[in-house]
Amino acid sequence: MKQNVFEVLMYLFENYLYNDEEPGDRDSLESELHEAGFSAMEIRKAFEWLDALADSRVLPAAPSGKSSIRLFGEPELARLDTETRGFILYLEQVGILTAESRELVLDRILALDDHEVDLDTVKWVILMVLFNRPGEEEAYNWMENLMFDVPTHLVH
């Protein structure tokens, strides 16, 4: 039996959100997830995670200065290694993440019950957050290209 909230989120994202397939009602989705092998507790946590992400769409944007520096707290340091923290800050520096979307990404990462989160998981959380935020289509497309484009090799 699968026991990871992130796996439930990935299943939903790949089968419904990312493929533009219309999901059924919540009860039918829960039944499908049970049939796919997910536990009731993980399904509930995944829906809570998605509800919190959806609720964040209505929060007003807070002004942020370009010269501000983000210091990570203990819970973030415990779950994110140097590479993942650097990647998040890099995306903010190049304009893919705003200060608001960065904070939402960090909030959603901490909401996963995983002890330590790897770079691939962080990339998927970023993609899910950008997908959910109105006006972030360009950033979403950039992030999607970063994740899925395979570089071509030149042959001489």
Curated annotation (Swiss-Prot):
Transmembrane segments in this chain: where? none
Q: Which InterPro entries match?
A: Smg
Q: Which domain of life is it from?
A: Bacteria
The cysteines joined by S-S bonds are none
HAMAP family reported for this sequence = Smg
> Family, per the entry?
Belongs to the Smg family.
Q: What is this protein called?
A: Protein Smg homolog
Q: Organism, per UniProt?
A: Halorhodospira halophila (strain DSM 244 / SL1)
